[in-house]
Structures are given as C-alpha cells and as structure tokens.
Amino acid sequence: MKTMILLGEGYEEVEAITVIDYLRRAQIPIDIVSINETLSTIGDHGIEIMADKLLDDIDTDSYDMVITPGGRPGAEKLAKDKRVTDLIAQQVARDKYVSSICASPIALEAAGITKDLEGTCYPGFEDQVHYKTFHEDITYYDENHKVLTSRGPATAVYFALDIIRILKGDAKAQEVADGLLLPIVEEKKG
C-alpha cells in the first residue's frame, strides 16, 4: 500500500508529522507531497517540512491512499486547489482510500463527495462539511466509501493508528501503539 500526505502552506504540523512518523514506523510507504511550486512547506506554526515530491510531478494513480492534514489555512488551500479536489474525487471513484483530519474535510466537501459520507471534522466546521451523517467520534471510518476522518491535533495519534489498522490490520496498529507506550498512557490517564 502506497500513501501520500498533501501539504499546502498552513497545515497543522502535529497532524502531518504524527501521520508521517507512525506510518513509517509501520513500514507503510508515505510520500510527503507539496501542492506548492517548491518542496518547502511551512506549517501553521512556522515549522518547515521539506516534501519528497511535488504534486505536479507524480503519478497519482499509483497511490492507494491520499491523506490531508488540517490547520485552517492549509485546509483552505487544499479545498481551493482543483488538482487536490479532483484527486480526492478520483480516489473515491476508484474505490481507493482517503483520510482527512481536522479542518481538511472541507477539501472533501469541495471535491463533492460528502453528501454520501458519514464522518467527522474539527468542531465548528460542521456547517462547512455537509456529511450524510455527522459523528462526534474521535475518528470515524466510512467503510462503504473508504474514507477516514478525525477531529483535530489531539486525535492525530488515533487517526494515524486507524490508517495503519485500515491498511495493515489490527496487529500492526497495536504493535505501533505498544512501541509508543500508548496503552500505558491510556491506562494511567484512566
């Protein structure tokens, strides 16, 4: 399974880095793809990530999953970029995976796919993302459409683990969670 995470200026760094790191721990290939004209991308809090590739330079058909992080400015850029919204619509039409967190489901809305979806998003964006059914879950996976959504920065851990679970199964997701000491943290937090 080959994945990409799309970064435009103003993405939420926690959501991007968590997904990239966890997928690499799970040995799931993930390309960091810039929607800019350069590989340099700057997050909402001024952190620079150098992308692996430019969106214009890749064969998007070769990817099994497209991932979009939130951060209001970054999500708005994704939603306004026709290359991105066309890619998201094509992924769903081809029965491939899409995963969006925080504000980035507005790109799903812009792609015209939310009317049939069940999902979630960052609080306050419900009026911009018109799901068939909205869920307040930490993450929500619409199995019929292969679309995973999540709420925001604090849910990025669970979002990334759910991506692993979807692509590589429960055992691999648990292995990564165990290595991160997540079960111990959850037990102590009670």
Where are these predicted regions, by residue range?
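Active-site-adjacent pocket-lining segments in enzyme domains
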Residues: 4-5, 11, 26-34, 52-54, ...
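Short, solvent-exposed amphipathic alpha-helices that sit
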Residues: 18-25
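Hydrophobic side chains within alpha-helical segments
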Residues: 16-18, 121
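Short gly/ser/thr-rich secondary-structure transition/capping motifs
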Residues: 45-53
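Membrane-interfacial amphipathic helices and adjacent loop/beta segments
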Residues: 39-45
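Short glycine/proline-centered loop/turn elements that form peptide/ligand docking sites
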Residues: 17, 34-36
